[in-house]
Regions:
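Catalytic center-proximal scaffold of phosphoryl-transfer enzymes
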Residues: 45, 74, 80, 88, ...
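Short, flexible loop/hinge motifs at secondary-structure junctions
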Residues: 1-159, 227-228, 254, 366
């Protein structure tokens, strides 16, 4: 077990961080996609008595409604430019000498080039018109002045335009550009602004946007499925906590059909109280990793908890990676981790094939095709669990699978569910990538502001909206929104219609 741990540690440190298993499949399943290359040898395929024969596979193919592999991908080539981009025509003309004597001339499009206009700093001077009136009252004349109403700003008194503030938000939360680098970029263009000013803008903008995030949360809780995940964040000035201690950014993904939402929430704790608060009032399916903090939430709120096969697969992949390499000239003997990984990979292969289908069709296919594979996995683990060291990586992976089994098989009962929590992990990835650049938040207030901005940006992206354009529209409209209906109109799915 110590050797196993050392090999895994060495692989994690030096090897590429891909989770693709070297051992893909021990069987030539009839459903296997043509694009999946099987590297297992015939000896490995025959190693386990449970491996189906060719006759078995032919019978399976006759019984199951097998989906044909997707057509081969087209060869890569130049993609056409988006039709919604503005276009400017540049006319290349002949000289008078060259076209002398021609009966006519005409233009043809010779080529297209993608162009960019670099950022440019300017000063907007608001010239407010005022009118002077002379009012006569009891033989006395008094001057009265009225002024044109200035547009409302979400941060009154700020020296930056809404466009500049949104530019700062998008650069940090979409592009992972820390404020100190934005400070130097603005200075290069002639705009002298300190990073403290930029940080204050980020916190100030979060206040009016909180109302919008609250409404998005209400819509998310009205859906049938929520996916949840959490990741670490360092907040330096969290009261009562060391600067180096772990705090957490939580993400929930869900919403009714046509109203996808991604919500972030900062909390210094990883206790069950946080998800309890985030999904209060929700009833449906909650898909998570194996973190025990979600268990009490689901029991208390009568929520069906869905497991994540990604985490299960990852544990068997670690067990596979930690195996000793076969000596030169000797055949590789497939291990129990290899066998289980092959079965798990078959589950994923089925999911890729049925991806275009409706929820009802997915449910049917899972019953016909995934259920038998799940039964094989469970039977194999039950038969072999006592044959491996309990504290070894394969033993730990088997224990995890057994403990999570009911949650891992729930996805086969509803075609709307996913085999893994990968969508929540993908939703939190922009935060993880950004964290590598800006490293930490200084204060809890800043971390909460970041959660609000990530929520709106990622929800806008999930609804097909460009974040910069969307946030400018929202921040110009919010100061004039006096009712819930007016704020509702600014939700991303209402603007994409």
């Amino acid at each position: 077990m110590l050797e196993e741990a050392l090999r895994l540690s060495r692989i994690k440190r030096f090897a590429p961080s891909s989770e693709q298993s070297g051992q893909t499949s021990l069987f030539d399943e009839a459903e296997t996609e043509s694009t999946i290359a099987l590297e297992a040898t015939a000896d490995e395929a025959a190693l386990d008595s449970d491996a189906p024969t060719d006759d078995d596979l032919d019978a399976d193919a006759a019984e199951l409604d097998v989906i044909e592999p997707a057509s081969p991908k087209q060869k890569p080539g130049r993609k056409p430019f988006a039709s919604n981009l503005p276009r400017e025509q540049i006319f290349i003309t002949l000289s008078d000498e060259e076209k002398a004597g021609a009966i006519s001339t005409f233009f043809t499009k010779a080529k297209e080039e993608l162009d960019i206009i670099p950022a440019k700093v300017r000063i907007l001077e608001y010239m407010q018109e005022k009118a002077v009136f002379l009012d006569t009252h009891q033989a006395e004349q008094k001057r009265r002045i009225i002024a044109a109403t200035l547009p409302k700003h979400p941060v009154p008194g700020a020296m930056g335009s809404i466009e500049l503030m949104v530019y700062v938000l998008v650069c940090k939360y979409c592009d992972g550009l820390p404020l100190y680098r934005q400070e130097s970029i603005l200075a290069r263009y002639g705009g002298e602004l300190g990073r403290a000013t930029l940080a204050n803008w980020i916190i100030a903008l979060a206040r009016p946007l909180q109302a919008l995030v609250n409404l998005i949360r209400d819509h998310q809780l009205a859906g049938d499925i929520i996916m949840a995940d959490e990741t670490r964040i360092q907040v330096l000035k969290e009261p009562g906590r060391p600067a180096t201690s772990d705090k957490f950014m939580w993400v929930t993904l869900g919403g009714p059909p046509g109203q996808p939402s991604v919500l972030f929430e900062y909390d210094p704790s990883r206790s069950k109280d946080v998800p309890m608060r985030l999904i209060e009032g929700f009833s449906g399916y909650l898909q998570t990793d194996g973190y025990a903090g979600y268990n009490a939430v689901c029991i208390t709120n009568h929520i069906t908890q869905v497991g994540c096969w990604d985490h299960t697969r990852r544990k068997f992949k670690e067990a596979q990676d930690a195996q000793p390499k076969p000596k030169k000239g000797k055949p590789h003997r497939a291990s129990k981790a290899d066998h289980l990984l092959s079965l798990i990979n078959t589950l994923y292969m089925i999911e890729r094939q049925i991806k275009p289908l409706s929820a009802a069709e997915k449910f049917q296919q899972r019953c016909q095709r995934s259920r038998p594979i799940l039964n094989k996995i469970k039977a194999y683990v039950d038969d072999n669990r006592q044959k491996v060291p309990k504290e070894g990586l394969t033993g730990l992976a088997m224990t995890y699978l057994v403990n999570q089994w009911d949650k891992l098989t729930i996805y086969c009962t509803n075609g709307e569910l996913n085999i893994s929590n990968i969508l929540a992990e993908n939703a939190i990835r922009p935060f993880v990538i950004g964290r590598k650049a800006w490293l930490f938040s200084d204060t809890p207030k800043g971390a909460r502001a970041s959660a609000i901005h990530y929520s709106l940006i990622e929800t806008a992206k999930a609804n097909g909206l460009e974040p910069y354009t969307y946030l400018i529209h929202v921040l110009k409209a919010l100061p004039n929104a006096d009712t819930v209906e007016q704020i509702e109109a600014l939700l991303p799915w209402n603007l994409k219609k």
